[in-house]
A protein has these predicted regions:
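Short gly/ser-rich loop at a beta-strand->alpha-helix junction or flexible surface loop bordering the NTP-binding
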Residues: 1-148, 152-216
Length: 216
């Protein structure tokens, strides 16, 4: 454990089998530590230090580590996988989402397959400006997150709540959101609508829902 201490501390108590091996540990060492109650098995090839503070969305962190199990957190770049879509919204604590799957973007040309039924891999191009570090994870920016959700025709009510929360918390500028949302207005049944009008439509719906709920 002494050889893994700095690594697990930097990764919120998590470590992959490959990272441990590169640090000088062996698979049998990890098995012994699990049997001794020192480590907990989180996911295939991912362990957590028992008793360590359990950070928010630990399962999401474990799934992200699986995307490039040989790399430590500070060695990862956009090409190795980024938290995205509904999972990114969870990281920003916007909307009222309870997704059944963890979502990531892995830009081409890299290919990655997973057997996990609770993980969805999207293939899309990303620039350095599309991502940021959030609590030790590479995550799509709030603006890019909205674009990704809208491109999948994410439920309008939920998208509106995500956008409204971002505006309320100053996570995104309304002008930038208007420009980003403009190409998707027609897909949401509002052809000929400007991005600003679409944004107002989404946020007005949330205001109406809140008002109705308050009068019930």
């Amino acid at each position: 454990m002494s050889s893994l201490a700095s690594l697990t501390e930097a990764q919120y108590g998590l470590v992959t089998t490959r990272q441990a091996e590169l640090s000088g540990a062996h698979r049998r060492d990890l098995s012994r530590l699990v049997q001794a109650g020192v480590l907990e098995h989180m996911a295939h090839g991912v362990y957590r230090v028992a008793g360590a503070p359990r950070p928010c969305l630990t399962e999401l962190r474990a799934a992200w580590l699986q995307l490039a199990p040989e790399l430590e957190t500070d060695q990862r770049e956009v090409t190795h996988g980024v938290v995205s879509h509904s999972s990114a919204a969870l990281m920003y604590e916007v909307g009222l989402l309870d997704p059944l799957r963890w979502e990531f973007i892995i830009p081409p040309p890299r290919r990655f397959r997973t057997r996990r039924q609770d993980v969805t891999i999207h293939r899309a191009r990303l620039t350095a400006g599309d991502v940021k570090w959030v609590d030790g994870l590479l995550v799509t920016t709030p603006l890019r997150t909205v674009i990704d959700l809208a491109s999948l025709r994410f439920d309008g009510g939920h998208l509106g709540l995500v956008v409204a929360d971002m505006l309320e918390r100053d996570l995104a500028h309304p002008g930038d959101l208007s420009v980003a949302l403009a190409p998707y207005a027609a897909a949401y049944g509002l052809p000929g609508t400007t991005g600003r009008e679409f944004l107002e439509h989404l946020t007005d719906r949330q205001g109406q829902r809140t008002s109705h709920a308050a009068h019930r």
